[in-house]
A protein has these predicted regions:
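Carbohydrate transferase catalytic cores enriched for Leloir-type hexosyltransferases
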Residues: 1-308
Length: 310
């Protein structure tokens, strides 16, 4: 059987949740399946994190944007490969494609009312693209996979779908997430103190960054020995904008914001943290919760969404 797997962004240097889910899924398939033939469809990128094997081939498709890659480049490549099955791993798929389709629909947050207005232009365009594509491809799917029963129930209720049409395949965490005892060499690259709180930030309103910063100022004002806050994935100009907008410039000296942190450094940063904070307003799963727990780190979560079940 010839199986094509869409994994467009796994070679990009700054990968995030869905990219890692696709990458780790492919790596595990590579270990256990020697019978079927796989074609991994990717964009060119700096991080060549996957190697070919006898029955697994990497096919690079070079288009300047995600929609063009998915709606023109991907169908064109499928015509050449002629696979028996296509698995699209990141919520969307080609609108015009005759290959039997399996879709991983991580969430339908993009179909729900927005929770704020501070999204980037890139996020807004991505939301519009998903809102257009997803309703038009769902009925074409042979099977839909989602990542938690919480999200499965939500999809069925929101889209009026029968539960039998959707299969839950839970996310997990990579084996390199484990307690690290000698973490100082890594943590010193990002924060110059031994004790700290760790937060994964984002400009998406659902990540709740503004309220975290407001709550952190309250903590600073009420604690006799406050700990600094390490914020991943937010650049200085974004932090400065939050602080100005919400009148929080007085807390800047207690914040560390190195920007994107490579996945290989996260186990040490989780292990060194006094606690990991994950209080986003809406998630379908929440992989960082498992990663932090696997490293032995206490986790502070909000009650919204799927996190209590996780």
């Amino acid at each position: 059987m010839k199986i094509a797997i869409e994994a467009q962004r796994i070679f990009r240097k700054e990968k995030h949740g869905m990219d890692y889910v696709a990458l780790e899924t492919i790596r595990e398939i590579q270990k256990i399946d020697r019978q079927n033939e796989y074609f991994i469809l990717v964009s060119p990128g700096e991080d060549r994190c996957l190697q070919e094997s006898d029955n697994m081939h990497i096919v690079q498709i070079d288009y300047p944007s995600y929609p063009l890659w998915e709606q023109i480049g991907l169908p064109s490549t499928l015509k050449k490969i002629q696979p028996d099955l296509l698995h699209c791993t990141g919520n969307t798929a080609p609108l015009w494609c005759h290959t039997p389709l399996i879709l991983t629909l991580h969430d339908i947050i993009f179909l729900e009312p927005k929770q704020g207005k501070n999204q980037s232009v890139y996020q807004k365009l991505g939301r519009c693209y998903r809102r257009f594509v997803v309703p038009r491809i769902l009925n074409k799917c042979r099977k839909i996979i989602t990542v938690s029963n919480f999200e499965r129930e939500h999809i069925c209720k929101f889209l009026h779908w029968e539960p039998k049409k959707i299969t839950t395949v839970y996310n997990g965490y990579s084996s390199h997430f484990r307690p690290i005892t000698e973490y100082q060499a890594v943590t010193q690259k990002y924060i110059g103190t031994e004790h700290y709180f760790f937060f994964l930030g984002n400009t998406d309103p659902k990540k709740n960054t503004a309220r975290i910063l407001q709550a952190y100022r309250h903590y600073l004002n009420t604690s006799s020995q406050p700990l600094p806050l390490l914020i991943a994935d937010l650049k200085e100009e974004v932090i400065n904008n939050y602080l100005r907008t919400y009148g929080l410039t007085d807390i800047k000296s207690m914040l560390y914001y190195p920007g994107y942190i490579p996945n290989k450094d996260l186990p040490a940063l989780y292990s060194g943290a006094t606690a990991f904070i994950y209080t986003s307003l809406r998630e379908s799963f929440g992989i960082p919760i498992l990663e932090a727990m696997a490293c032995g780190t206490p986790v502070k979560i909000g009650r919204a969404s799927c996190r209590e079940r996780v």
